Amino acid sequence: MRTSQYLLSTLKETPADAEVISHQLMLRAGMIRKLASGLYTWLPTGLRVLKKVENIVREEMNNAGAIEVSMPVVQPADLWVESGRWEQYGPELLRFVDRGERSFVLGPTHEEVITDLIRNELNSYKQLPLNFFQIQTKFRDEVRPRFGVMRSREFLMKDSYSFHTSQESLQETYDKMYEAYSKIFSRMGLDFRAVQADTGSIGGSASHEFQVLAQSGEDDVIFSDTSDYAANIEFAEALAPSAPRAAASEEMKLVDTPNAKTIAELVEQFNLPIEKTVKTLLVKAVEGSAYPLVALLVRGDHELNEVKAEKLAQVASPLTFATEAEIRAVVNAGPGSLGPVNMPIPVVIDRTVAAMSDFSAGANIDGQHYFGINWDRDVATPEVADIRNVVAGDPSPDGQGTLMIKRGIEVGHIFQLGTKYSEALNASVQGEDGRNQILTMGCYGIGVTRVVAAAIEQNHDERGIVWPDNLAPFQVAILPMNMHKSYRVQELAEKLYSELRAQGIEVLMDDRKERPGVMFADMELIGIPHTVVIGDRNLDSDDIEYKYRRSGEKQMIKTGDILDYLVKAIKG
C-alpha cells in the first residue's frame, strides 16, 4: 500500500473528549472516527487491525471444533418474552416496532436466537455435542458510552454457544474454549489473566473472565504471587484470619460522637486504628422474612462485596441498600450510628470481623458509638460469612502465596450456562433412553473491538502505538527520503516494496511529498513494527537504515541484505 493511495488521517493534536490513551491514539492514528455517542466508523488503518483480531479468533475457534454461523442483529421480541429477559434486561436493550406493529430488539447477545434455532434443527442426542460461533455486530444502549470503543453502544463480538446432553460433555467443551481463548490472547501478544468469576445473572455452574492487565482497566484482577490462582474481585475468597481472636482487654463504653458519621471521621476525631473499627450496612431482607432488613458488618478498612452479600439466604436479590427512612423505622438511628449491640434485626458479620476484639461500632443511637466491644461478652457472635472484598496482601485461597491486585480490561468471558435458556425455550432432544432431554448449554464471548483498545492500552509509548507483531496494520514501513528528487532512492524503494509484497509481507510505503519529520512521526504513531529509511547519504555507502519500533533500536543494513533481514525478522 502507498500512502498516496491510502487514507492515513493522522492527527497531531489529541481530541479533548478522549479520556484514555487507547481512545486518544485510535483517533490520532486515524483508526476510528466518532459518528455519534458510542458509535464509531472504522477507517482503513483501524479496520486492518480489527480484521487481524477477527482472523486470529476465527482460526482458533475453527481449531477448537466450533462451527461458524451468522444470526440476525434484529431479533423478534417474542423470543425475549419467552426467555423471560424482555422484562429483566433493562434499558440497555434497544426495542422498536416495525411498520406491522411487531416488536423487535437490536441484539445485545444471541442466546435466544441460537436456542430457537437448535430447538427446531436438532432432535437426537446423536447430533451432539455442537458448538456454534459468529463474529457479528452487537448493540447495547449504554447509558454513558465512554473510552472510545472500550465501552461503545455498537461493537463487534465473537459469541459462541455449545449444546450438550450431559455436564461432562459441557465441561469438555468448556475446557476446549478455555484453551482456545488462552491461545487467542497469547497469539495477540497480550499480557492477560484467566480469572475465576461469578456467574452473575446469567447463572450456571462455572465462569472465567479473560482480563488484559492495564492501568486504565475498570476491573480488579486478583492473583497469587506464587501460584496460578486468579479471580476477579467479586469471586475471590477472603479467608478467615489464621490467628485466634485476641482476648478482651478493654471494657465496653458508650461514647458521644456527634460529629463522626463515617468511619473516616470516627478514626480521625478519636485517633483510632481503622483496623479496630466496624462499619454496619443495612440491606433489604429476602421477601417473606420476619424482618425487613439485614445488617452486614465489615471491618472499617474493608469493602462489602455485594456479589457475595447477595448470595446470603437472608438477603434480597438484587442487593438493595436500605434508605435512611427505612433504617430509622427499624433501628431508630441514622446510617452513621449503627452497630451490632442491641441490633433488632438479623446480623451477618465478615470472617475478619469475627476475629476482632476491643473494636468500635455505632451504638444504634444517633451521635453515639460503643468502644471496646467484644464478641460473646457484650454481644453474641452472629452468623459469620465471607462478605468482603479481598485486599492486596491477603493469603491466597489456594494456600499458596499472597494476593496481588492489578487493574484489568475484560476482553473475554466463558460461562457454563446449564439449562437456563433451554428450559425457558423448551430446547430438547430425544435422549439415549428415548425420553426428551433438556439441553445443557455453554456460552463464550470475546469483545473483538475491545481487544483492539486493550492491546493499545498495554502497548504504547510517548510517540504512539507499539503494536504486537500479529496485530499491526502493516508489518513494514518504507520511508524513501526525497524520492521525488532522487532516482536511485525511488528505484530502490520501489524494488524493495515489490519484493516484500511478493513475500506476502504487508508493507506501507510513504511516497508523500512530506518532510522526513512528518513521515517518521506518522509511522511511529501508527505503530508499524519494522521501518526502513532509504536516503541518498546512506546509499553512498550502500546502506539502508532499519529501526525496530518496540525497542527503538536502529542499525545499518546493506542494500543487498535488507530483504532477507526483514523476511527473517517477520517470518522467523
From Swiss-Prot:
Keywords: Aminoacyl-tRNA synthetase, ATP-binding, Cytoplasm, Ligase, Nucleotide-binding, Protein biosynthesis. The keyword Aminoacyl-tRNA synthetase applies. InterPro entries: aa-tRNA-synt_IIb, aa-tRNA-synth_II, aa-tRNA-synth_II/BPL/LPL, Anticodon-bd, Anticodon-bd_dom_sf, Pro-tRNA-ligase_IIa, Pro-tRNA-synth_IIa_bac-type, Pro-tRNA-Synthase_IIa_type1. Its EC number is 6.1.1.15. It catalyses: tRNA(Pro) + L-proline + ATP = L-prolyl-tRNA(Pro) + AMP + diphosphate. GO terms for molecular function: aminoacyl-tRNA deacylase activity; ATP binding; proline-tRNA ligase activity. It is an enzyme of class 6 (ligase). GO terms for biological process: prolyl-tRNA aminoacylation. It is found in: Cytoplasm. Coiled coil: none annotated. Its main location: cytoplasm. The keyword Aminoacyl-tRNA synthetase applies. It comes from the Bacteria. GO terms for cellular component: cytosol. Consists of three domains: the N-terminal catalytic domain, the editing domain and the C-terminal anticodon-binding domain. Belongs to the class-II aminoacyl-tRNA synthetase family. ProS type 1 subfamily. Catalyzes the attachment of proline to tRNA(Pro) in a two-step reaction: proline is first activated by ATP to form Pro-AMP and then transferred to the acceptor end of tRNA(Pro). As ProRS can inadvertently accommodate and process non-cognate amino acids such as alanine and cysteine, to avoid such errors it has two additional distinct editing activities against alanine. One activity is designated as 'pretransfer' editing and involves the tRNA(Pro)-independent hydrolysis of activated Ala-AMP. Homodimer. This is Proline--tRNA ligase.
